[in-house]
Curated annotation (Swiss-Prot):
Residues 1-18 form the signal peptide. Belongs to the PrsA family. It comes from Geobacillus thermodenitrificans (strain NG80-2). It is found in: Cell membrane. This is Foldase protein PrsA. A lipid is attached at C19 (S-diacylglycerol cysteine). One of its GO terms (biological process) is protein transport.
Length: 278
């Protein structure tokens, strides 16, 4: 996530570099003087120029051989959202979705290059598929004690509205105001007792009170993804299994080799050591 916080600077530098020819046009004017495009560009280059240039070189070299689809970027975004939650949302607010998607695309290009020579067996792929659980979408009502949980469940059994009761009773500040909606989640994202109960429910079905360390939950599954066939998931599974075997040093060395083979020539004397810095 940290590198995404540089994304605004990256985009600004790229835009300014296109028009930087000793440009004295002001980007900011004050009563104490102006800040020119040239001054702004040079300062940006000094602060983040080498990082930006390395990213641009990697993208240019890798995109010639490897392709990343919008669907792959979407899947990666979902994975990142599950792992980082509000940090991802903050990155999008600060930098814009387009910039974040470009950063993710570059990460996937690097990963595809690095995993190219990693071997996986059919057994490993089948095992991953068998253990894979599609995402579910659920709502819940969280209360502190079993007595209250049973009272709420009785109201639900009589046909009262789940979302309305969630707003009235639920002690989960993150979902109560949304009628208890937790959104989509996959395996391993909830505590064990909650997850097991949610995955057993059919769409529209409501659980009995489930006890966890947080209290008592009443769960309603509102939607479920359908599990694709192995053949339809094979490419995605192969990538994930290979990536699980990858270490950062392997990725860096593979990308470095491809960049070296591309015979990159850096003409800006201030940035000529970019490829020597890791």
């Amino acid at each position: 996530m940290k590198k995404w916080m540089m994304a605004t600077a990256v985009v600004s530098l790229m835009a300014l570099s296109a028009c930087n020819n000793g440009d004295s046009e002001a980007v900011v004017e004050t009563k104490n003087g102006a800040i020119t495009k040239d001054e702004f560009y040079n300062e940006m280059k000094e602060r983040v120029g080498k990082t930006v240039l390395r990213d641009l070189i990697d993208e240019k070299v890798l995109s010639k051989k490897y392709k990343v689809t919008d669907e792959e970027i979407d899947r990666e975004i979902e994975r990142i959202k599950e792992a980082y939650g509000t940090q991802y949302d903050l990155a999008v607010q600060q930098n814009g979705e387009k910039v974040i998607r470009e950063m993710i695309k570059l990460d996937l290009l690097r990963a595809k290059a690095a995993i190219e020579d990693i071997k996986v067996t059919d057994k490993e792929l089948k095992e991953y598929y068998d253990n894979y659980k599609p995402k579910v979408r659920a709502s819940h009502i969280l209360v502190e004690d079993e007595k209250t949980a049973k009272e709420v469940k009785a109201k639900l059994d009589k046909g009262e509205d789940f979302a309305k009761l969630a707003k009235e009773y639920s002690q989960d500040p993150g979902s109560a105001s949304n009628g208890g909606d937790l959104g989509w989640f996959g395996a391993g994202k909830m505590v064990k007792e909650f997850e097991e109960a949610a995955y057993k429910l059919k769409v529209g079905e409501v659980s009995d009170p489930i006890k966890t360390d947080y209290g008592y939950h009443i769960i309603k599954v509102t939607d479920k993804e359908k599990k694709k066939t192995f053949d339809k998931m094979k490419e995605e599974i192969t990538f994930e299994v290979k990536r699980s075997k990858l270490d950062p040093s392997t990725m860096q060395s593979k990308v470095d080799k491809l960049v070296k083979d591309a015979n990159v020539k850096i003409k800006d004397k201030d940035l000529q050591d970019v490829l020597e810095q890791q």
